[in-house]
């Protein structure tokens, strides 16, 4: 994935994923919602990540916020700023149901966050 990203002309890399939790945490009422992972929150990464979380929360996903890590390959090995969006926890029945009912709205929310970021900058 990183090699493919690095071979293209772009400003940012956005990877869309779905989260999952172990069986002990599936129904705990806490392990649900959207989050965006970045290596750090400088520049476009922090602002756009917050916007994406906020837009997804308007659909009804719990806003788990922006999280940082140095341990994800896709965030470390791309030559442009990178975001990894975890749309929801597919292991949580409520999250999975919300996603299935709002697939198009999820895509629109991510696009709207990008458009809002571009208007501001």
Description of each model-found segment:
Residues 1-34, 38-47:
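Catalytic-core regions of hydrolytic enzymes
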Residues 2, 46-53, 107, 111:
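Extracytoplasmic/secreted envelope proteins and their assembly/folding machinery
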Residues 8, 15-18, 22, 65-121:
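Active-site-adjacent mobile loop/cap segments within catalytic or ligand-binding domains
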Residues 37-39, 55-58, 102-106:
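Short, low-complexity, polar/charged sequence segments that are solvent-exposed and flexible
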Residues 44-67:
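Active-site-adjacent substrate-binding region
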